[in-house]
Each structure stands twice: as structure tokens, then as C-alpha cells.
Amino acid sequence: NSRRLAVYTVEFFKDKQELRGEEKAELLNRIRECLTEFEEGMVRMQENMGRIYFIAVWNKDTSKILCEFLKKRIVPGNGISFRMAAGIMVNSFSQIPRSRTSSERGLSYCFYLGENTCFDCSQRHMDKIIWSLDGEKLRYACIVKDVNVIMEIADDLLKTAVSDDFMDPYDLLKSAEGILHILMVNVRKNEDNSSERMKQMQYFRQLEECSYYDSFYKVFRQLLIELTSAGEQDLIKSRNPLFLDIFEYVN
């Protein structure tokens, strides 16, 4: 789909504090003026509740191009940096106020890569999981019904971020955390396992030790298998759709 739209949220910082006031306004004005560098309709910018959004026609180079574009707008040596998160644009932003439960028929995934997001998957209604999204940094989310679509864009963003130092490793870890949470709800065998959180933290420590993108996904894949308490072939035979999606992606 040549017109697939990705949504990037960007936060600017100075000396590890969120950029505000006149300095932020000047930077945003520079960015707006330079958007003409892009082909018409390829990238547009929105601001809402202090957060900056870029809606872009996505292809395999979009993340890198946008990162380079933003780097050029920042004056070297002035201490300004940015972090970027990515999602897929479906129809429009769905505002999700903090601590409000969001339930949607057919909702599979609802997250931005790189966001410091907490997934509370403990609530169930009939056979449908109700996702409760709670996190200080999560103000908006996109509804995604196809894991392969979000993984494709996630993969592109993360490779760009890791290889060019655009994303802090902590953000990469948080991206994995969301997927592990979802997997724990869908394929875990013992829902009353009191040691589950401890086990999860052990997984995160292993991921934290990975220095490179390839080693990260090698460990991540192994953790996914261990988490299900079954072997690959058993899981493939069970035809669990979530596992098959992730299995296909990490392979």
C-alpha cells in the first residue's frame, strides 16, 4: 500500500528537560517552514496538547528521512535533542485519557513504539480482553488491527533508531515490554502464576544486556518461546494466531 500512513510523535528536550516556551516555538516555526522540502502531501505536522505529530506517507526510508530532517533543524551545540515514537494511522487519533479503559471490537494492538506505556491486561469481558492503557506519556493512540503492519513500521523505526542513535535503548526495551505483556495475556498457561511479574522483570534484564539490534531480537524471540511454556512446534500446531504472527515476524 503506497499510501499507508504512519504517525510519528516527537518530543523535544533540552538538558534532559522537556523543551518549552519561546525556544520550542522558534524550533517548531523552523520545522514548519522547512516542510516544503518534502513532496506535497507526503508529510504534515500537527500539534495537540503540547505534543507534536507528523503524519507521513510511509515507506521503508520514512523513519530515517524524518529523523535526518529533524536533526538538521536543531542548532548544533545548543543541547536540544528529541525522541520519536511511531504508530500506524488508521482513521484518526483516538484520544484516550489517562486511566480510562478503552475497548474496541477487533482491537489487537494499540501502542506507539518508544512510548513509556503501561499495559494493564487484567480486565476481561466475556471472551474479549479489555485493554486498559495507562501511562503519563500516553495521550493519544492509534488503533491497529494487523500485527504485521505495526511490526513492519516498528522494525523500520527501530533499525533507524538503533543504528543512528536516534532512540535510547530504554525506548527499545519499552517497545518489547508491550508485546510481552500482550503475549502473557493471550498464550500463558497459568493465569494465577504469582511469580509472573518477577519472571517478566528477568526477561527485561536480559534484553537490557543486548548491545545490538540483532542480538536484541535473538534474545526477544527466545523469551517469547519461553514465555509460552511450550516448544515452537507445539505452538505452531496449536495455531494460536498471536504467536504465529510474532513467530513469523521474528523469523
Language-model regions, residue ranges each:
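Cytosolic nucleotide-utilizing catalytic cores of signal-transduction proteins
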Residues: 3-4, 11-23, 32-251
